[in-house]
Amino acid sequence: MPTITSYFGFLLASLIFTLALFIGSSKIRLL
């Protein structure tokens, strides 16, 4: 069970990091 939870947490963190990076790149492009 802990393995699945840690994997889900890692996946969620990766998704958030990618989304934040995409938004940052978009803002830089607008500027």
From Swiss-Prot:
User: Looking at the record's lineage, which domain of life comes first?
Assistant: Eukaryota
The record's Gene Ontology cellular component field reads: chloroplast thylakoid membrane; cytochrome b6f complex
> Pfam families, alphabetically?
PetL
Q: Which cysteines are joined by disulfide bonds?
A: none
> Which biological process annotations from GO are given for this protein?
photosynthesis
Residue intervals passing through the bilayer: 4-24
Complex and partners: The 4 large subunits of the cytochrome b6-f complex are cytochrome b6, subunit IV (17 kDa polypeptide, PetD), cytochrome f and the Rieske protein, while the 4 small subunits are PetG, PetL, PetM and PetN. The complex functions as a dimer.
The name this protein carries in UniProt is Cytochrome b6-f complex subunit 6
